């Protein structure tokens, strides 16, 4: 049964809770190093730092507390925001980045690498709660956990009987315990918080799916901007970011030689495409599993073998899930794998790999090799190596995407926050950023790469029916 006594109480006297404040100077230096690689954010500071469109607004962030995110926080701060921040993954925080932001005073930070699930949801609620008990005006979300917490809070206040139930999912039970404590203290709190939220900008595919589900069900409580499907996010962060950070995570964790290995990539969306390119680039033979005939055909025509997971488990040396779905690699799949196959996930949540099977099946034994690297001996007698407990391998075992590609993503996030802050006419639905802004985000990053852009003549522009200033493609163009 749900029990408020299990939930750790909030401590609103805290300005931060991080692993080690002595890392702040290291974080500050690393932050300076990223500036040149994040031209989009630096330009937004120059453009909007004077007018401060976020002045007086409270912003909650639930997004990986990395050096790149520290630059996003700095940008929002320079635009006038009052910020509280938590990470959106228990393993993704870079402790020196969290310390640097906490020391700077730009945001109240509640994040450290290696949180428990109880810690994680405490940090999320701390980020959603100001010292006077009020909530945010704006949300920056990655995976939708801050949005989920508010929506579940309102749902519980409308139907307190939900708090009398027990839940099989451990993490969901932790959420409900926290909401039970909040309900005991103030049974109308989350309805007041939700009513004040001007909107959320959502960073990733999984969180966007949640938003569209809420919209379709008529349950979305405030406007939302889908940042993930901006071209300069999905076609860059998801593809080129994963192309570099996947290999970084696998190699830091295992020191494995990828060349000559068979790598199985589950899912061939933008993330899967980047993963497949990465592993092929290191000399692996890449197999792809897919449910979508279009993506499957794309993979086949790029030269990848497309097969089922049931077939792939027989030959794979390294497995990467990139689907955003659940139970992609099941217990039966793991039992059939080669001895010491490496299994990891680069989707947002930890349910793509059936960790519940490993943790709850008699005969499955875990040996921790080092942080975020576990050797599981299975009932078959063989072993597999699971990275980051099935959570994001690139952030759990490495430092995530490079600064340059995150500059494009976070420039979109900042523009979305400005839109939510300044447009009072937005309804309770999911919006996307206009093509003109997408092109501007790309334009801001060209000089850093030495790109020289060709300009249309008036005759050429008239011939194809566009302005010489853009936008150059219709909204339905897929890139």
UniProtKB/Swiss-Prot annotation:
Kindly state which reaction or reactions the protein catalyses. S-adenosyl-L-homocysteine + H2O = L-homocysteine + adenosine
Instruction: Provide the protein's localization.
Output: Cytoplasm
Residue sites binding NAD(+) per the record: 204-206, 238, 267-272, 290, 325, 346-348, 394
The main place the protein resides is cytoplasm
Query: So which cofactors does this thing need?
Result: NAD(+)
Q: Part of which pathway? A: Amino-acid biosynthesis; L-homocysteine biosynthesis; L-homocysteine from S-adenosyl-L-homocysteine: step 1/1
- Biological process according to GO: L-homocysteine biosynthetic process; one-carbon metabolic process; S-adenosylmethionine cycle
Which PROSITE patterns does its entry note? ADOHCYASE_1 (PS00738), ADOHCYASE_2 (PS00739)
GO molecular function annotation: adenosylhomocysteinase activity
The record's listing under CDD domains reads:
SAHH
One Pfam entry for this protein is AdoHcyase_NAD
Question: What does the entry list as the binding residues for substrate?
Answer: 66, 142, 203, 233, 237
> Which InterPro entries does the UniProt entry name for this protein?
Adenosylhomocyst_ase-like_sf (IPR042172), Adenosylhomocysteinase-like (IPR000043), Ado_hCys_hydrolase_NAD-bd (IPR015878), NAD(P)-bd_dom_sf (IPR036291), S-Ado-L-homoCys_hydrolase_CS (IPR020082)
User: What does the record say about how the cofactor binds?
Assistant: Binds 1 NAD(+) per subunit.
Supply the alphabetized keyword list: Cytoplasm, Hydrolase, NAD, One-carbon metabolism
EC numbers: 3.13.2.1
Q: Which GO terms describe its cellular component?
A: cytosol
List, alphabetically, the NCBIfam families matched: ahcY (TIGR00936), PRK05476.2-3 (NF004005)
User: What is the purpose of this protein?
Assistant: May play a key role in the regulation of the intracellular concentration of adenosylhomocysteine.
Q: Which family does it belong to?
A: Belongs to the adenosylhomocysteinase family.
| Name this protein carries in UniProt | Adenosylhomocysteinase
The organism of origin for this protein? Nitratidesulfovibrio vulgaris (strain ATCC 29579 / DSM 644 / CCUG 34227 / NCIMB 8303 / VKM B-1760 / Hildenborough) (Desulfovibrio vulgaris)
